[in-house]
Amino acid sequence: MINLFRGLLVVLCFASAMVSAEEKNILVTSGSDRAAPIAVVPFGWQGGSVLPEDMAEIISNDLRNSGYYAPIPKQNMISLPTQASEVIFRDWKALGAQYVMVGNITPAGGRLQIQYALFNVATEQQVLTGNVSGTNDQLRDMAHYIADQSFEKLTGIKGAFSTRMLYVTAERFSENNTRYTLQRSDYDGARAVTLLQSREPILSPRFAPDGKRIAYVSFEQKRPRIFVQHIDTGRREQITNFEGLNGAPAWSPDGSKLAFVLSKDGNPEIYVINLASRQLSRVTNDSSIDTEPFFGKDGSTLYFTSDRGGKPQIYKTNINGGGAERVTFVGNYNANPKLSADEKTLVMIHRQDGFTNFKVAVQDLARGSVKILTDSNLDESPTVAPNGTMVIYATRQQGRGVLMLVSINGRVRLPLPTAQGEVREPSWSPYLN
């Protein structure tokens, strides 16, 4: 489903004049170079029963999803070592592997003890070794942890594979009977649990910076209202109750404020509320549509979408006052801004001049260059991993709303497993303890 604001903004764009003076000649690129081959050998298992999870497969998928590594398929492996002393480096050199990981799982007093080691094939040196223990139910957590440790050791970038994701499903049973469900899962779509069910739409779920609360829009009162919910207890608090549109909540970096969109005074404008004092401040004041706020790291800069220049583009402003500065200049539509962790890259929904397709793209904020990451037609709601290496977004495949993951370097693009029905509105968690 195309975002409500997108539809409204597009209508306004076709009725508006072209933007002229601010256009810049900026390169648009796509594609990327080769990922590093890595072999994650199936872990040895010293127990009797079959384990419920394949550790090596989860680790391989995590490293693949980052876009940095290309796992070597198990069927291509010449040998299957499970500990460091069994690694024959010539086997992995023959396969072109740059790195090889081995591991072993041992039952110990009702728990599982996992030992693992990672090697540089060219130098034949061990670069990482470790131990982790847990229960059968924690196998997936331990696999994500090992992937996080390995990724950080090899790249210097903190791994984001132990994070979570929010999304909304919509299952239509009849014309007037649709069930909306707010789900939380692993970042890769596994282990989904239901946080909220409603017969009315749920929109724009967002994790708080502490990962313990979420904000979202609910139509349960037959009109849009913003709620904050505590994940562990399910306790909810209604934040807004204004006439008209109440939408697009975004957390400040310290979790003390929410930015959102209200139309109580006419057209949609961006406001910020202090959650402790409930003091409401208006940020934008323009005759155009201003929507989709996103906080910068400093807690005072807001990126947002506006058609004030004639077509939807991304701007930034200060919540304490001042004018808005245009950020995007390539294409006739740029919306739904998100920032990478280092704030060097802007992730957005982009439409090129002369085209009708909406795609996920990234803009280098220093150079202004734009790279398109996806090849689908109706992308929306991009959300960025806390380390900035991956993006999850909603799109359509075979007439159904689905979630996709794309690496920020464009090397990997794949669908995420989710429940039946229409799936939309993904939101990536921060790092979790």
UniProtKB/Swiss-Prot annotation:
UniProt keyword Nucleotide-binding, yes or no: no
Signal peptide as annotated in the record: 1-21
UniProt keyword annotation of NAD present: no
Gene3D superfamilies, sorted: TolB, C-terminal domain, TolB, N-terminal domain
Major localization listed first in the record, in broad terms: periplasm
Subcellular location: Periplasm
Family, similarity comment: Belongs to the TolB family.
Function: Part of the Tol-Pal system, which plays a role in outer membrane invagination during cell division and is important for maintaining outer membrane integrity.
Subunit relationships: The Tol-Pal system is composed of five core proteins: the inner membrane proteins TolA, TolQ and TolR, the periplasmic protein TolB and the outer membrane protein Pal. They form a network linking the inner and outer membranes and the peptidoglycan layer.
Protein name: Tol-Pal system protein TolB
Annotated source species: Pseudomonas syringae pv. syringae (strain B728a)
